[in-house]
UniProtKB/Swiss-Prot annotation:
MF terms in GO: ATP binding; UDP-N-acetylmuramoylalanine-D-glutamate ligase activity
InterPro entries associated with the record: Mur-like_cat_sf, Mur_ligase_C, Mur_ligase_C_dom_sf, Mur_ligase_cen, MurD
Pfam families the record matches: Mur_ligase_C (PF02875), Mur_ligase_M (PF08245), MurD-like_N (PF21799)
Function: Cell wall formation. Catalyzes the addition of glutamate to the nucleotide precursor UDP-N-acetylmuramoyl-L-alanine (UMA).
Sequence positions that bind ATP: G117, T118, N119, G120, K121, T122, T123
Reactions that this protein is recorded to catalyse: UDP-N-acetyl-alpha-D-muramoyl-L-alanine + D-glutamate + ATP = UDP-N-acetyl-alpha-D-muramoyl-L-alanyl-D-glutamate + ADP + phosphate + H(+)
One Gene Ontology CC term in the entry: cytoplasm
Record-listed E.C. numbers: 6.3.2.9
Name of this protein: UDP-N-acetylmuramoylalanine--D-glutamate ligase
HAMAP family listed in its UniProt record: MurD (MF_00639)
EC class name: ligase
Pathway(s) annotated for this protein in UniProt: Cell wall biogenesis; peptidoglycan biosynthesis
Swiss-Prot/TrEMBL keywords: ATP-binding, Cell cycle, Cell division, Cell shape, Cell wall biogenesis/degradation, Cytoplasm, Ligase, Nucleotide-binding, Peptidoglycan synthesis
């Protein structure tokens, strides 16, 4: 990493939220910045003018050439694959390539609690942040959610704490990143269109711990085989959590109680049925949050209060409204089959499920088995509609409706739902075939449902 960015030539690839934040930050550090994107993203009025006024040169609709004479450093946004030509050219030329997470870490003075995993990252990151805030700590919550870390890290000092949601894409370009506490919630199939194999995907998640030492902590899910297996390569102190079995040390559930035992001191945190979050998967998220909080020295009575008050975050099993006796649940963040399975398992009522979108190389067979077990009707849409319907039929599930668009999907679900049912949006797919983000998808779902409620 460059030690001084004054007059250094930096190419930032990817003009999304992360790329914009990196560009603004490096210009303030005296760098000459070119922000490039293969597409031409839509920005709010005045955004491009503000960037150019700040000194950022824009290259939208294509990438500039990369050579040692024109570029000293390449910063890749997490959404951009490392196989794009400017990155490959930089590697060939020996030009350093990094990402926003690594860059932010370079300027960080605060201890970091970093959370990764296939599912549950945002909920767990937000919960840990609330635990620290309630304990009186000055806390930044960011990374893959909220503000990019690079935009905020210099405002926080050694006595503060940073809680970061970290994706596999961000970890790909992390070389010296060293969180005080690293959390891996689970590793199930996702993003295989980018990582290729589960082995590659797990290895990328393991980069979380590559630079940790004996004074750091690795929080791992004992119930998830791939996550638990990461212990073999960890040099820091491992804290396991489990909702299925009792542990000699770590955080687990015993007799309906959340129990923590670190350094030989066992204590009850709270009852598991006191949690403000629905679903067994959210119990796992809470156990991980307890483990991270205990690693940072938070007292149990303080964190127990937060566990009771915390009601979750938007687009994750978010209750929207009850219309004509039917409850509508927004789980737009259920962007892979495992997340949608966990959503289906969270409810005992009859479910009308809305699923479909852009496939990320997923296998829908296990998801289809859960659909047969839990759903009364499946409404499919988007690029993956046929694949999901085919998988469901292979399991003997025939009550399938096809929707041409998102609004039609919600209206079809409403038509077949009866009082006491749940209409659940948990797509098991990404949103990019129809929306810019899962947030946009979830917001439209809420808008449609609330319009139905108004009549």
């Amino acid at each position: 990493m460059l030690k001084d960015f004054t007059r250094k030539k930096v190419l930032v690839i990817g003009a999304g939220r992360s790329g914009l934040a990196v560009s603004r930050f490096l210009v303030k550090k005296g760098a000459s910045v070119v922000l490039a994107d293969a597409g031409k993203p839509d920005y709010p009025d005045g955004e491009l003018e503000d960037l150019t006024a700040a000194g950022v040169e824009l290259s939208l609709g294509g990438y500039p050439g990369v050579g040692k004479e024109s570029v000293d450093l390449v910063v890749v946004s997490p959404g951009v694959p490392l196989t794009v030509e400017p990155v490959r050219a930089a590697v060939r030329e020996g030009i350093p390539v990094t990402g926003e997470l690594e860059l932010a870490y370079y300027f960080t003075r605060s201890p970091i609690v970093a959370v990764t995993g296939t599912n549950g990252k945002t909920t767990t990151t937000t919960l840990i942040g609330e635990i620290f805030k309630d304990a009186g700590m000055n806390t930044l919550v960011g990374g893959n959610i909220g503000s990019p870390l690079i935009a905020e890290v210099e405002r926080y000092g050694p006595d503060d704490v940073i809680v970061a949601e970290v994706s596999s894409f961000q970890l790909e370009t992390a070389s010296t990143f060293r969180p005080k506490v690293g959390v891996v919630l689970n590793i199930t199939p996702d993003h295989l269109d980018r990582h290729g194999t589960m082995g590659n995907y797990a290895a990328t998640k393991a980069r979380m711990f590559a630079n940790q030492g004996p004074g750091d902590f690795a929080v791992l899910n004992c119930d998830d085989p791939l996550a638990a297996s990461l212990k073999a390569g960890v040099r820091s102190r491992v804290i396991f959590f489990s909702r299925r079995k009792e542990l000699k040390e770590g955080v687990w559930v015993s007799g309906g109680m959340i129990v923590a035992s670190l350094n030989g001191h066992r204590e009850v945190v709270c009852r598991s049925d006191e949690l403000g979050l629905p679903g067994a998967h959210n119990l796992e998220n809470a156990l991980a949050a307890v483990a991270a909080a205990k690693a940072m020295g938070i007292e149990s009575n303080s964190l127990a209060g937060t566990l009771r008050r915390f009601k979750g975050v938007a687009h994750r099993l978010e209750f929207v409204a009850e219309v004509d006796g039917v409850r509508y649940i927004n789980d737009s963040k259920g962007t892979n089959p495992d997340a949608a399975i966990k959503a289906l398992e969270s409810y005992g009522e009859p479910i009308v499920l809305i699923a479909g979108g852009k496939n990320k190389g997923s296998d829908f067979r296990e998801f289809a088995r859960k659909v047969k077990e839990k759903a009364k009707v499946l409404v499919v849409l988007g690029q993956s509609a046929g694949l999901i319907a085919e998988a469901a039929r292979a399991e003997g599930f025939e009550n399938i409706l096809y929707a041409d668009g998102f609004r039609e999907a919600v209206l079809l679900a409403r038509r077949v739902a009866r009082p006491g049912d749940i209409v659940l949006l948990s797509p098991a797919c990404a949103s990019w075939d129809m929306f810019k983000s899962f947030e946009e998808r979830g917001d439209l779902f809420k808008e449609i449902v609330l319009s139905l409620k108004k009549g």
